[in-house]
A protein has these predicted regions:
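Enriched for short, Lys/Arg-rich terminal
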Residues: 1-3, 12-16, 20-23, 27, ...
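A short, surface-exposed loop/turn module that caps and links secondary-structure elements
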Residues: 31-59
Length: 91
């Protein structure tokens, strides 16, 4: 079981997201908690670095993405660092 943390700056953005994107995000977070941060079954999943991952929550225009980071040293802790449109994603 993994621990998923949503920082305050990300949590403040959640109500502004479309309902469909919010539902997709919460489904993704449940999967990360249960199965870990590598989510190859999600659309356009990609490993951005050794600790940073991302996937698309909604295709089309605008595309919404989620970016999360895992902590090194074997601690099962994941922090969501961005949820929003593809254009502003911190790649």
């Amino acid at each position: 079981m993994w621990t998923v943390h949503i920082p305050r700056r990300v949590a403040r953005q959640l109500p502004k997201l479309p309902q469909r994107v919010q539902r997709s995000l919460f489904a993704l977070l449940r999967e990360i908690e249960e199965a870990g941060p590598v989510r190859g079954n999600w659309p356009n999943y990609g490993k951005l670095s050794s600790t940073r991952h991302h996937c698309h929550l909604k295709k089309g225009h605008p595309t919404y993405v989620a970016v999360w980071e895992i902590t090194p040293a074997g601690v099962r802790f994941v922090e969501v660092i961005y949820v929003g449109t593809h254009e502003k994603a911190p790649y």
